[in-house]
Amino acid sequence: MRGFGPGLTARRLLPLRLPPRPPGPRLASGQAAGALERAMDELLRRAVPPTPAYELREKTPAPAEGQCADFVSFYGGLAETAQRAELLGRLARGFGVDHGQVAEQSAGVLHLRQQQREAAVLLQAEDRLRYALVPRYRGLFHHISKLDGGVRFLVQLRADLLEAQALKLVEGPDVREMNGVLKGMLSEWFSSGFLNLERVTWHSPCEVLQKISEAEAVHPVKNWMDMKRRVGPYRRCYFFSHCSTPGEPLVVLHVALTGDISSNIQAIVKEHPPSETEEKNKITAAIFYSISLTQQGLQGVELGTFLIKRVVKELQREFPHLGVFSSLSPIPGFTKWLLGLLNSQTKEHGRNELFTDSECKEISEITGGPINETLKLLLSSSEWVQSEKLVRALQTPLMRLCAWYLYGEKHRGYALNPVANFHLQNGAVLWRINWMADVSLRGITGSCGLMANYRYFLEETGPNSTSYLGSKIIKASEQVLSLVAQFQKNSKL
C-alpha cells in the first residue's frame, strides 16, 4: 500500500478515537520540571533514530519497536498540554534537518552543475541533497506508523501540536516545519484512494449515528428525532472512513435535496420534509449545508474537498436529472470583523463611515442613541432581531458589508473567511448572500443571521479553482458584485 511504509497493513490503523486528556496547567518550574526535561531529552535521544549515511540508507536495520513504543507510552503519560508542547518543541528543534549536511550537499550539486558533469553524477548528487533535507523526526513518525494504533496516535499528536501552537505554548519555524512534515505524511496515509464513502441512514448502526451526531459542529443535533430528520427523506448524510476502519467517520457531509437553492437553514434542519416518500421529479438541487471534520489532527488534509466530489458523483447516479449543486454556508467571523471595524471607525474618525447618512439617521431614530455605540451594543447580542424595524433598517447595510467581507477582505490575497476560502478553492461561485438565513442564537451572534450560497457549476469548477488559486480571482454572481459595488460607493473606507 503506497504511503503506509513497508510492512504497514490495514490492521495497523485502529479507530481514530483516543480518550480526552485534560489540558492541565502550564509546565511546572523548579526541580520537578528540570527532572522532566532531562527525561524528555533522554527519551528523544533513544527514540529518534539517527540518520544513516547515504550509502547505508537501505542497509541500516529499523530501530527496535520498543524504542518507538517508549515514545508513545511516555507521550501518552503527559497529562498537561504544556508538557506535551514542551516535548514536541524539543523534538522539532533538536531533531530536524542537519543544516551543515544540506549546505555541503548543496555546494556539491552547484559544483557539478558548473563542471557540466554527466546527468547520472548530477542526479546522484541531487538525491544526496534530497536525502539530507529529510528531518530526523520523520523517521520517528514513520516507525511509529507501523505500530498497532500508530497512525491514530500521530493524528492525535498533530491535534495536540495544533492546539499548542494556538495557545502559543510552542512556536517558531522549526515547529511549523514539523507540523508541515506530519501533515504531509497524514495526507499520504489518508489520500482519496484509501477512503470509503459511506451513507448514513436511520438504519445505520446506533454507534455510527451517535458519532455523526457528536461530530456535527455547524448546526448541533438536539435529539434523536432531529438526527432522524437529517438522515431521512429528502436528506442525505455521507462520511469518509479509512479503508482499514469502516464505520469510523473522519469527515461528514449533510445534504438537503430540494427544488431550488435554499436560503434558510431552519427550513432544512427544523421543518419536516413534504412527505415520507421522496418524489424524485421534485428534486432538482442538492444543498451541502454542513461539513464537519471529526479529527482535529487531520486539519489541512483535503478530506472535505474529496468528499464533496465523491458525493456529487453518488447523487448523480441516484438522481441523473439533478443539475444544481450548492452549499448553504455559515459566515463565521463576520460579526467580529464588523465590530472591529466599528471600533476602529470610532477611534480614527469619531463617526460612522460604514453606513450612509440616511441609514445612520433611520437607525438612530429607531434606537434613540448614537449610531456607533448603539450598533456595537446591538450586534454584541441577539436582541435586535426582536425589532422588525431594526431588522428592516439593518438589512441593506449589513448585506452590503457582508458581501465586502466575503469578496473583498483578504489574507495573503485569498478570501479571509475560511468557509469562503474552502469553497472557492474547490471552484465554487460566491452565488448569493441570504438575509435572516440563520436565526438561531449562534447564527445571529456570529454572522448577524446571514448565510451564503457557494454554487458548484460542475464544468466550471476546475477553471474557477485554477483562477482562484493561481490568480486569486473570486468568481461571484451579479447579486454579490452589485452589493460589493454598493459598499465601495457608500462606505467611505
UniProtKB/Swiss-Prot annotation:
Outcome recorded upon mutating C206S: Abolishes formation of disulfide-linked homotetramers. Abolishes the cooperative enzyme kinetics that are seen under oxidative conditions
Motif (Microbody targeting signal): 491-493
GO cellular component: cytoplasm; cytosol; mitochondrial matrix; mitochondrion; peroxisomal matrix; peroxisome
Record region (Alpha-helical domain): 40-190
Positions of modified residues (N6-succinyllysine): K168, K222
Impact when changing S329A: 110-fold reduction in catalytic activity
Region (Catalytic domain): 191-493
Keywords carried by this UniProt record: Acetylation, Cytoplasm, Decarboxylase, Disulfide bond, Fatty acid biosynthesis, Fatty acid metabolism, Lipid biosynthesis, Lipid metabolism, Lyase, Mitochondrion, Peroxisome, Transit peptide
Protein's cellular compartments: Cytoplasm; Mitochondrion matrix; Peroxisome; Peroxisome matrix
Major subcellular site: cytoplasm
Record GO biological process: acetyl-CoA biosynthetic process; acyl-CoA metabolic process; fatty acid biosynthetic process; fatty acid oxidation; malonyl-CoA catabolic process; positive regulation of fatty acid oxidation; regulation of fatty acid beta-oxidation; regulation of glucose metabolic process
UniProt subunit comment: Homotetramer. Dimer of dimers. The two subunits within a dimer display conformational differences suggesting that at any given moment, only one of the two subunits is competent for malonyl-CoA binding and catalytic activity. Under oxidizing conditions, can form disulfide-linked homotetramers (in vitro). Associates with the peroxisomal targeting signal receptor PEX5.
Name recorded for this polypeptide: Malonyl-CoA decarboxylase, mitochondrial
Organism of this sequence: Homo sapiens
